Swiss-Prot record:
Disulfide bonds join 18-67, 28-58, 29-41, 68-79. PANTHER family: HYDROPHOBIN (PTHR42341:SF2). It comes from the Eukaryota. It comes from Hypocrea jecorina (Trichoderma reesei). Disruption phenotype: Leads to wettable and fluffy colonies. Results in thinner hyphae and impairs the formation of aerial hyphae. Belongs to the cerato-ulmin hydrophobin family. The gene is hfb2. This is Class II hydrophobin 2. InterPro entries: Cerato-ulmin_hydrophobin (IPR010636), Hydrophobin_sf (IPR036686). Aerial growth, conidiation, and dispersal of filamentous fungi in the environment rely upon a capability of their secreting small amphipathic proteins called hydrophobins (HPBs) with low sequence identity. Class I can self-assemble into an outermost layer of rodlet bundles on aerial cell surfaces, conferring cellular hydrophobicity that supports fungal growth, development and dispersal; whereas Class II form highly ordered films at water-air interfaces through intermolecular interactions but contribute nothing to the rodlet structure.
Amino acid sequence: MQFFAVALFATSALAAVCPTGLFSNPLCCATNVLDLIGVDCKTPTIAVDTGAIFQAHCASKGSKPLCCVAPVADQALLCQKAIGTF
């Protein structure tokens, strides 16, 4: 039973800040219009393993951490809030 509990916490610690699938691209976006459209988005320059790291990294650049569909010309058409961020 103890192994299961430890394995469960280890797995959740390794969880990504963005879900797999459509919204799998972590981006730092200057603006999030209607909580749906990311504007002036940039790829993080460090590994963003946790929501707190992702949030701090984007905030240092004046941006918001978002999980988006593949961006085109620095514009992400569909974005959602990253896991573990506020």
